């Protein structure tokens, strides 16, 4: 990683995202851009531009002062960007202008609604497909050692696997595929075993076709069930540090941008989650075998 963008509203909800972004930048020797947008407060009936000039300047100065205080002693190359306006528009514009390797942010609110927990900023970045987004929820206890990537064998899932491998080269990667259990007449146990073996083979073929470095070891896991349930269960049992998913796919639950599997995973998992959109200029990988 050479460039990381932290999207923050300077609230306590983004403190963990700040700590993670600083750690990632320091470990990779990357430049960290910290961006915040001064939006109109719901409690303030006056537009920011209509405020007296000294109040406008105070908000800018206070925000910069807070960020500089937070950066003190962090030993990281950082750039601060503070603008008036909508956060989503600012982050998307910065991402397009600078081609960041990773965009880091925190959760918006702890409610049961997808839009509220992630916020419009994350939605805007995913919708415009300007880069992978790391949603930080946990306290920083060290680098990411283990990463679980959910796959439906789509190009979006492939993008998630590539991103996890490129961004975190030292982490152990596990790819999990949730398949539909065998149905219909016949020997159920035999059919289940056949479905399991077929899913494992498809998973291995998918990994090979992604064409990661030859030295990169990938573990494949397949199980019948719902993707979000299995991903969360495996992540808990295997003590996974980070989940990674693509935001488009061919699976019925991943078929739309920010589909229900992706939403349910972010909502229900306490773990940090890497959301990877398929970038507009990506082309499908060649088949292997």
Task: Enumerate the language-model features and the residues they cover.
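A short acidic, glycine-rich active-site loop
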Residues: 51-63, 191-201
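General small-molecule cofactor/ligand-binding pocket signal
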Residues: 33-35, 79-83, 134, 174-176, ...
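Short, well-ordered secondary-structure micro-motifs
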Residues: 44-46, 116, 160, 185-188, ...
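Small/aliphatic-rich secondary-structure junction motif
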Residues: 1-50, 146-189, 212-215, 268, ...
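Conserved N-terminal glycine/acidic-rich loop preference
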Residues: 107, 125-126, 134-163, 180-216, ...
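Glycine-rich, Arg-bearing micro-motifs that act as flexible, cationic patches
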Residues: 102-124, 143-144, 242-268, 278, ...
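Structural beta-alpha unit
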Residues: 20, 39, 50-55, 69-103, ...
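Short, acidic/small-residue loops that bind anionic groups at enzyme active sites
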Residues: 124-138, 268-277
């Amino acid at each position: 990683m050479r460039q990381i963008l932290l999207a923050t509203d300077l609230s306590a909800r983004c403190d963990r995202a700040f700590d993670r972004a600083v750690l990632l930048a320091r470990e990779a020797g990357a430049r960290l851009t910290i961006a915040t947008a001064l939006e109109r407060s719901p409690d303030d009936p006056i537009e920011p531009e209509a405020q007296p000039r000294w109040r406008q300047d105070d908000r800018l100065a206070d925000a910069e002062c807070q960020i500089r205080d937070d950066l003190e002693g962090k030993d990281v190359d950082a750039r601060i960007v503070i603008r008036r306006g909508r956060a989503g528009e600012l982050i998307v514009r910065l991402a397009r202008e600078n081609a960041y390797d990773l965009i880091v942010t925190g959760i918006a609110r702890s409610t049961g609604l997808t839009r509220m927990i992630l916020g419009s900023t994350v939605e805007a970045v995913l919708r415009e497909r300007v880069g992978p987004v790391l949603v930080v929820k946990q306290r920083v206890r060290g680098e990411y050692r283990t990463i679980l990537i959910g796959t439906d064998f789509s190009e979006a899932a492939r993008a998630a696997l590539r991103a996890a491998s490129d961004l975190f080269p030292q982490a152990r990667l596990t790819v999990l595929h949730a398949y539909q259990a065998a149905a219909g007449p016949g020997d159920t146990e035999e059919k289940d075993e056949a479905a399991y073996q077929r899913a494992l083979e498809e998973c291995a073929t998918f990994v090979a076709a992604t064409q990661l470095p030859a030295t990169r070891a990938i573990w494949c896991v397949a199980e019948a069930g719902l993707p979000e349930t299995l991903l969360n269960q495996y992540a808990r049992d295997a003590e996974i540090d980070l989940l990674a998913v693509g935001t488009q796919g061919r699976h019925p639950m991943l078929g739309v941008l920010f589909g229900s599997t992706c939403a349910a995973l972010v909502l229900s998992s306490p773990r940090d989650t890497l959301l990877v959109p398929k970038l507009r200029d990506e082309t499908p990988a060649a088949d292997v075998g």
